[in-house]
Amino acid sequence: MPEVSHIEPGPDTFRILLTTDNHVGYMENDQIRGDDSWRTFAEISDIAREQDVDMIVQGGDLFHVNAPSKKSYYHVMRTLREHCWCDKPIEYKLVSDPSDAMATKHFMYPAEYDSNVNVGMPLYAISGNHDDATGEELLSPLDVLSVAGLLNHYGRVIDNEQITVCPLLFNKGETNLALYGLHSVREERLMKTMASGNLEFLEPDTSADPGIQWFNLMCIHQNHVHRPGVKVVEETCLPSFLDFVLWGHEHDCHPSAVRNDITGAYILQAGSSIATSLSEGETLDKNVFVLSVKGKDFSSQPIRLKSVRPFVMKDVVLSQTGLSATSSNKKEVLNFLIMQVELMIGKANEIWKHNNRKSFEDGLMGESDAPLPLIRLRVEYSGGYEVENPRFFSNRFVGKVANINDVVLYYKKRR
C-alpha cells in the first residue's frame, strides 16, 4: 500500500476531497468574523467541484454546535444544494448494504441513490464532539441534512458500550473502497469499550473472491495529540488492516499523511478550516486534501484555503528586549508593544496577498479586499514591568484587527 507522488484521474481512480472541523456557525453573530465559517465552507465546496472529485468525506464538527442557528443551516444547505446537487454522473457503485453503516431510521441509503434528488457530488460526514447526537431520538444536525438529501451521515454510534463499525463498500473500475466512520465518543468511554473487546470493525467479505483487494479508508474524531490531563486514542488502537485514516478534532493542519510504523496505516490530521481559538496551532496554513486511490496505491494533494482570515502570533519576553523594568518606563514598553502589533498586522496582510496572489495579479483583488487579521501577541512581563490593561491595549487596534478585545495576552514566568 505505497503512497505515490501522483495518480492520474481515470475510470479506476477514486478522487475524494477530505475536510474536517469546519465549525460552521462559529462567532456567527460577530460583526467582523460572522461570515468566516460559511465563506470557507463554500470555498471548500468550490474546490471539490473544480477538482472533479467523486465525493467529499468530512471528519466531524461540520457545525460548531449541535443545535445550529437558522442562519448556519441556511448557509450550509445552500452551499450543498449549489454544489452537490448537479448533473455530474456518479462513476462508482455501492456494492454493500448501507443500512448498518448509516444506521438511520429513514432513508437508509446514500442520497446519490435516491431517484427523487440529483446528487452528483455526495458528501459523507461523521458527527464530531460539537455536532453530536442529542435528545430522545439521538438526532444530530447531520441527520437533518441527511434526511433532506444534502449529505450522507454515517458512522453513527447507537450504544457506546457495544460498537460495531461497518463500512460502506464502493467499486470504481478495478478499485474497491471500504469507507469506515466512527463518530466522536468520549475518550474514557471509548477506551473502556476497546479494553472490554466490545469495539468491532467489520472487514469486507472476500470469501467469494480471495484475490480482491480493498482500500480501507477510516474517519475518526478523537483526541490525537498528547497533552497534560487529556486522554487520547492511540493510533495503534485502530485495526491494522486500515490503509488511511482521516483524523478529525485536532485543529493543527499537517501538510501530509504520516505512516504509523506499527500498523502501517497513513494518518492524516487535516486540521480545521477556521480558527476557533487564538492558539499556535491555528496559525498554520489551512488546507483541504484530494485523496486519489487506485487499487492499493494512493496520493494525497494538499490545497491551501484562500478565504481563511490570516492569523499571526508572536511571543515577546520583555526582560530580553533591553527595556528597563521601571514604572517610569511604562510608556516606552507600551510603544514597543504597539510597534510589534503593527508589524504583525503588516505580516498578516502579506500572508493574505501571498495566498491570493493570482487574484491580485489578475486585478480581481486589491489592498482593500484584505480582511482584518487575527493577531495575538503573547507578552511575558516578569521582573516588575508595568503594562497597560489588555482590553484597553487591544482596543487601540479597532479597524485594524478582527479580534479587537484580545490582541495581547500577558503572563508571568512560573517560579
Regions found by a protein language model. Give the residues of each.
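Active-site C-terminal subdomain of aminotransferase-like
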Residues: E282-D285, V290-V308
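N-terminal active-site segment of His-dependent metallophosphoesterases
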Residues: M1-P110, G211
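Structural beta-sheet core signal
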Residues: L18, Q58, A125, M218, ...
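His/Asp/Glu-rich metal-coordinating catalytic cores
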Residues: M55, A67-S292
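Accessory, non-catalytic peripheral segments of nucleic-acid enzymes
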Residues: S299-R415
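Solvent-exposed loop and beta-edge segments used for protein-protein assembly and interaction
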Residues: G10, V117, I212, V333, ...
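Conserved hydrophobic helix-helix packing surfaces used for dimerization/oligomerization
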Residues: I16, L179, L374-I375
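Alpha-helix termination/capping residues and helix-transition junctions
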Residues: E50, P210, P239, D369-P371
